[in-house]
Each structure stands twice: as structure tokens, then as C-alpha cells.
């Protein structure tokens, strides 16, 4: 029987098969952070249970941490309690922890791949919705709830239904200044935020093959915004090169054995998908979200849509509501929208390639006096590499604040927030109402588009000099 990549990984991890396409799957890697794990550990103690596979469980502090200080008190009392609890839990149950004093500490979906924990063909779970990021390596990865966190800690397994298969093939020639973020936002805009519900999406095509691993992670990270359970990209030479000699990657003869297995992790020819889409991205422009959902997105040179242009009454109402919240008028140009803050970071776009691309735009430029801009590396390793390359100096000279690793302004769960009515050009993944702070208005963009917004409004990065002179 011909199988898709998803079916191969799913079938290889079945511990017990039940009725109605539901199975108990073995979990190869369990990632933890300070927000969704405390209750799970409390339940373990109440029931006198232990962690079955501590060596397959790794934790970090990222959601609540201060990006201005390594002091555990810096993010407030609740954050301090959660971080102290994570330290206690990891010590008691013998789990490796990347705490504030660990030079490798960072966002869970950044440090997993860079440490070689994320491996092709593995199953990976975390109490965080953007766990799909790891699918860029050909790993079946998805977010889970706190009760499931407890179940995996105790059994190293999880009951999962078999999801449907979707293939998204991306073809065409990628033009200069068009990034992986633009491509995935464009696709979400075309298909919608519920298009992936009930599916695992496999991304493929020449465009994907030419992407580096950081770009692939951006694609898979944002697939969850289509409603998908997970996303996958088949591993290839680019994957192997990225993983070679990482701390936890297989070594010596085990590396050779791993490569042989990883090369089997491709969808069989003529395997059946439940849905298939092909997108030619040759002519797309830089993308900017205008509303309060990732699918409310336009090319930079377009206007905010007229409500009456939506034939669907629900979409019309959503557009009206979004414009009210975002304080935008139909017919106004995206390029005329004034920005209060710029945020470069998050598990979507805080890796070294993201910072390099943004720094290229910012070199010898200064931010407007009317805006505040911060750049938050995704991990200590990313921060150190950026500083070795002098990227921090470029950001600082441009007027950015160079911060410590963490989730930062992606979510209003730490000190980095928008105030009521503030508008942000953000490289994060969600633009929901209040996502970056109560009353905050979020526009999702690529790192280079965020960098180009330093003049206090959106700019077509392709025409940066001509539009800002």
C-alpha cells in the first residue's frame, strides 16, 4: 500500500490500535515550558506517579521570561512562581532544563531544532500550539493540552486519531524580498484559517526544496493558523546538513543508520491525499495582515477591502469587526497605516537567518522618533551568533533595543506588551484581538517588512529607498 509521509510516521509509532482510526502512539520527544506544565506535575504527585522517560523530556523557560533581565523576579510574581515551579519539577523528576542561567535557553521551538532534539521521523509533542514548527524536519509534531502533558509524562504515549492528508505544493520563482513568511501568509489568505481543520499538511514542491531549514520552520510554524493538526516537510540533504554535529543528533555509526532511515521518509509515488493544492508564488508581493485573523491579509500595495466585496455574510461581518478593532477604514492603503512599535522575534521569525535579513535592511538607517522597536533572538545560541556577526550593533545603531531570548511580544504574557490602541508591525504568528496586549493592534509581516516599517508606517521593502526619501 502506498503511504504518505504522515502515514509512515503515524504507523511506525502505533503501540495499540483501537477502533475508528484511533491509536495509542509512542512519543519520541516531549518538550515542556513553564506555563502549561505545572498542573501536570501537581497531578503526578497527587497520584504518586513518576515520569516514564525523563531523558526524552526537555524543558525551557520562554513564555513568561523577561527579555531585559535574567533576574527571575523581573517578569512579576506569577511568572516567578511558574518558573520556580518548573525548576522544582525538573529537579524532582530528573528532567533537563534550559533555565535562565543556561546559555542555550530560549524559545522551545527554536532550541529543539538547534540542539538536535528534533529529528526526522520522530513524534514530538509540547503544550504549545506552534509545535508544528518541528514538522520542517519531517517530524510528526503537534501541540497538546495540560492533561495530555501529564499522560505523556507518565506513559510516553498518547491516544491520537488518524487525521486526513493534505498536500500543498509550492512552485514558481521566488523573487527578491519575498520570504517564507510572505508565502505562508499568502496561502493562509487564499485557503482560510479553517482550511486545515482535521488535516496534517505536507508542504512540497521546488520552492520548499530550495528553502533553508529556518524558512521551512516558518512555513510549518504558521500551518497551525490554517487550523491544521500538524505540518510536514520531507527531510533531505538540507535537513541532514543542518542536523549534523548538533548536540543531540546521532553520531558516528548511528548517524549513518539514521540517514538510511531518514531517506525513506518521503511520500510514496501515487500515494493518495484527501486534498491537494498547488500555489505558484512567482508574482506575489510582500504580505501584511490588516485584520484580526491571519487570513485577513493583503499585498503591501493593496487597500483595506470594502465590506461589500465579501459575498459571504460571515466574512463580511468579520471584516467589519476587524476594521473596527484595528481602527482602519475600507479603501485606505496599507502603506499609509502608521506604526507605533516594531517587534522582530517569536518562534516564527527569531532565528539567525531572520535576524540577518532584517539587519541587511536596517544597515545605516535610523528608526523614526515616533516608534519603539525591539529585536528578541529566539535563543542564547542565536543571540551569541548574531553578536559574533555584529548584527546586534546594526540593530542598536538603528535604534532597536537588543533583548534577551524569550517569547516576548508574541503574546501578552510577559512585560513586552502593546498598550491599548498601539499598533505593531510584528514577525509573530497571531494577530488576534489582544494577542500582544489588551487593545493592541497587530500586523503580521516578515522580518524584512518589519525592519522596513521603522519609518513609522508600512513600506514596500522592494522600494525602500524611493519610498522613504
From Swiss-Prot:
Cross-referenced PROSITE patterns: ACONITASE_1, ACONITASE_2
Biological process terms in GO annotation: L-leucine biosynthetic process
Cofactor binding notes: Binds 1 [4Fe-4S] cluster per subunit.
Cofactor: [4Fe-4S] cluster
Gene name of this polypeptide: leuC
Record's keyword annotation contains Amino-acid biosynthesis: yes
HAMAP family membership: LeuC_type1 (MF_01026)
GO molecular function, one term: 4 iron, 4 sulfur cluster binding
Top-rank taxon, per record: Bacteria
Subunit structure as annotated in this protein's UniProt entry: Heterodimer of LeuC and LeuD.
The protein's name in its UniProt record: 3-isopropylmalate dehydratase large subunit
Taxonomic lineage from the root: Bacteria, Pseudomonadati, Pseudomonadota, Gammaproteobacteria, Enterobacterales
Amino acid at each position: 500500500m502506498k503511504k504518505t509521509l504522515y502515514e509512515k510516521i503515524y504507523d511506525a509509532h502505533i503501540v495499540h490500535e483501537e477502533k475508528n482510526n484511533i491509536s495509542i502512539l509512542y512519543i519520541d520527544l516531549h518538550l515542556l515550558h513553564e506555563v502549561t506544565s505545572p498542573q501536570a506535575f501537581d497531578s503526578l504527585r497527587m497520584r504518586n506517579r513518576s515520569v516514564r522517560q525523563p531523558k526524552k523530556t526537555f524543558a525551557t523557560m520562554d513564555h513568561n521570561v523577561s527579555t531585559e533581565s535574567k533576574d527571575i523576579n523581573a517578569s512579576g510574581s506569577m511568572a516567578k512562581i511558574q518558573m520556580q515551579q518548573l525548576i522544582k519539577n525538573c529537579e524532582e523528576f530528573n528532567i533537563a532544563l534550559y533555565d535562565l542561567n543556561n546559555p542555550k535557553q530560549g524559545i522551545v521551538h527554536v532550541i529543539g531544532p538547534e540542539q538536535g532534539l528534533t529529528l526526522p521521523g520522530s513524534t514530538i509533542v509540547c503544550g504549545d500550539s506552534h509545535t508544528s514548527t518541528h514538522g520542517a524536519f519531517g517530524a510528526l509534531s503537534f501541540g497538546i493540552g495540560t492533561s495530555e502533558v501529564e499522560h505523556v509524562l507518565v506513559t510516553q504515549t498518547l491516544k491520537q486519531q488518524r487525521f486526513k492528508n493534505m498536500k500543498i505544493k509550492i512552485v514558481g520563482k521566488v523573487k527578491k524580498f519575498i520570504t517564507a513568511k510572505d508565502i505562508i501568509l499568502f496561502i493562509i489568505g487564499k485557503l482560510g484559517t479553517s482550511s486545515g481543520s482535521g488535516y496534517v499538511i505536507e508542504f512540497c514542491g521546488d520552492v520548499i526544496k530550495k528553502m533553508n531549514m529556518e524558512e521551512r520552520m516558518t512555513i510549518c510554524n504558521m500551518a497551525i493558523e490554517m487550523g491544521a493538526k500538524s505540518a510536514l516537510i520531507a527531510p533531505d540533504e538540507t535537513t541532514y546538513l543542518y542536523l549534523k554535529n548538533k548536540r543531540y543528533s546521532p553520531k558516528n555509526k548511528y548517524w549513518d543508520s539514521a540517514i538510511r532511515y531518514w531517506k525513506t521518509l518521503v511520500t510514496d509515488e501515487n500515494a493518495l491525499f484527501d486534498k491537494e493544492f498547488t500555489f505558484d508564488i512567482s508574482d506575489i508581493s510582500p504580505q501584511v495582515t490588516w485584520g484580526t485573523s491571519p487570513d485577513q491579509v493583503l499585498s503591501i500595495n493593496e487597500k483595506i477591502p470594502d465590506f461589500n466585496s465579501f459575498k459571504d455574510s460571515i466574512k463580511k461581518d468579520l471584516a467589519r469587526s476587524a476594521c473596527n478593532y484595528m481602527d482602519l477604514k475600507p479603501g485606505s492603503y496599507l502603506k499609509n497605516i502608521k506604526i507605533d512599535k516594531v517587534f522582530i522575534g517569536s518562534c516564527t521569525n527569531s532565528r539567525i537567518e531572520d535576524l540577518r535579513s532584517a539587519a541587511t535592511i536596517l544597515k545605516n538607517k535610523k528608526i523614526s522618533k515616533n516608534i519603539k522597536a525591539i529585536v528578541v533572538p529566539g535563543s542564547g545560541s542565536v543571540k551569541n551568533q548574531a553578536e559574533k556577526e555584529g548584527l546586534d550593533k546594526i540593530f542598536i545603531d538603528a535604534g532597536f533595543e537588543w533583548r534577551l531570548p524569550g517569547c516576548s511580544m508574541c503574546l501578552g504574557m510577559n512585560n513586552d506588551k502593546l498598550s491599548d490602541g498601539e499598533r505593531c508591525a510584528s514577525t509573530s504568528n497571531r494577530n488576534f484581538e489582544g494577542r500582544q496586549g489588551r487593545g493592541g493592534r497587530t500586523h503580521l509581516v516578515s522580518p524584512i517588512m518589519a525592519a522596513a516599517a521603522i519609518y513609522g508606517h508600512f513600506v514596500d521593502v522592494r522600494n525602500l529607498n524611493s519610498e522613504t526619501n
